[in-house]
């Protein structure tokens, strides 16, 4: 049967590096209540203040990593889409972005018009967060309601500890670890701490001591930090990397609120001060290289590390469109449970 579509969903990107396009993208992204989780009037005020200077700054950053074909994240996601067409045997493989184009609404509407009633929704985020996974699911629900679409959805669950994901990481990163290096830093995207507190169903575990490695399953199921730490530990164990030669940090802090620590910026300085000369950095929260990996780590992070006394920071590419990753992702999608 070929009546079951697969919809891959990633974050998105501005349409171009023009300031106006970047402003439009940032406005859509930051006004999402799952991203900035404060009441609408305050969120509108805060985002309006951010949009005074941030679009020009971000446009410059995007321009520094933009490819001839377009946004690296979009280009790489399209390549993964093509690779998945060789693996998914049940119907078409489509790609949507949560922000920007092609939108979830555009793609779901087209699939409905083509007669598809079964869709596997695949948010391309290994670890759970409301600002990534939940917002994708809720947007799909909104579209179905608004358009009165007759569709059933299976939803790919966070796969932070799944053997397929860990194996794909291992095979992708292994060649880089075969070269001499002093330390491996696993830099995950950060989140405000309040996002974690809100999602602790017990109200007893979040950020208390090192609860992430001992919390019960019901807590871990919605704890981004716990899932990041467990992803890192599973990867290091599979690779046989000794304790002390790898560590975890969190990047991309926005605003003044307390975010998950340790911050990647601080960790880069600490590692250089500890005598680390050759540093490898991988970003396991991202399945495709993007501004947060290429510019924030590969450019600015590398410069910061050298200024702090290090000699070389090597950014390990994300999974991107690696054929082995496509095979493993297909296995994950095949067993996505029916949810919507």
Curated annotation (Swiss-Prot):
One GO BP annotation of this record: heme biosynthetic process
One GO CC term, this protein: cytoplasm
Pathway the protein acts in: Porphyrin-containing compound metabolism; protoheme biosynthesis; protoheme from protoporphyrin-IX: step 1/1
Localization per Swiss-Prot or TrEMBL: Cytoplasm
Class of this enzyme: lyase
EC number assigned by the record: 4.98.1.1
Disulfide bond listed as a keyword: no
Catalysis performed (reactions): heme b + 2 H(+) = protoporphyrin IX + Fe(2+)
Record flagged with keyword Lyase: yes
Binding site for Fe cation: 189, 292
Stated role: Catalyzes the ferrous insertion into protoporphyrin IX.
Name of protein: Ferrochelatase
Source organism of the structure: Pseudomonas syringae pv. tomato (strain ATCC BAA-871 / DC3000)
């Amino acid at each position: 049967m070929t009546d079951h579509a697969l919809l891959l969903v990633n974050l998105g990107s501005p349409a171009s590096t023009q300031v106006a396009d970047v402003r439009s993208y940032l406005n859509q992204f930051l006004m999402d209540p799952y991203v900035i989780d404060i009441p609408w009037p305050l969120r509108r005020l805060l985002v309006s203040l951010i949009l005074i200077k941030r679009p020009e700054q971000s446009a410059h950053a995007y321009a520094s990593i933009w490819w001839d074909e377009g946004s690296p994240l979009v280009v790489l996601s399209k390549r993964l889409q093509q690779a998945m067409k060789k693996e998914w045997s049940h119907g078409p493989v489509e790609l949507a972005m949560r922000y920007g184009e092609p939108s979830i609404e555009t793609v779901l509407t087209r699939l409905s018009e083509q007669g598809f009633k079964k869709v596997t929704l695949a948010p391309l985020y290994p670890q759970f967060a409301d600002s990534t996974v939940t917002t994708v699911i809720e947007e799909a629900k909104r579209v179905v309601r608004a358009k009165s679409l007759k569709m059933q959805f299976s939803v790919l669950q966070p796969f932070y500890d799944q053997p397929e994901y860990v194996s794909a990481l291992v095979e992708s990163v292994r060649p880089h670890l075969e070269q001499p290096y002093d330390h491996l830093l696993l830099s995950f995207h950060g989140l405000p701490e309040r996002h974690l507190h809100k999602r602790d169903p017990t109200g007893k575990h979040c950020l208390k001591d090192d609860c992430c490695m001992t919390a019960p399953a019901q807590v871990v199921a919605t704890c981004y930090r716990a899932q990041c730490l467990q992803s890192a530990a599973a990867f290091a164990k599979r690779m046989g990397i000794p304790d002390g030669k790898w560590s975890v940090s969190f990047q991309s802090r926005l605003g003044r609120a307390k975010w998950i620590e340790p911050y990647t910026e601080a960790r880069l300085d600490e590692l250089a001060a500890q005598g680390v000369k050759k540093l490898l950095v991988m970003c396991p929260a991202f399945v495709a290289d993007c501004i947060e990996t290429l510019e924030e780590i590969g450019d600015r992070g590398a410069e910061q590390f050298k200024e702090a006394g290090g000699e070389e920071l090597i950014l390990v590419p994300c999974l991107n469109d690696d054929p082995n990753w496509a095979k493993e992702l297909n296995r994950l999608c095949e067993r996505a449970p029916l949810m919507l």
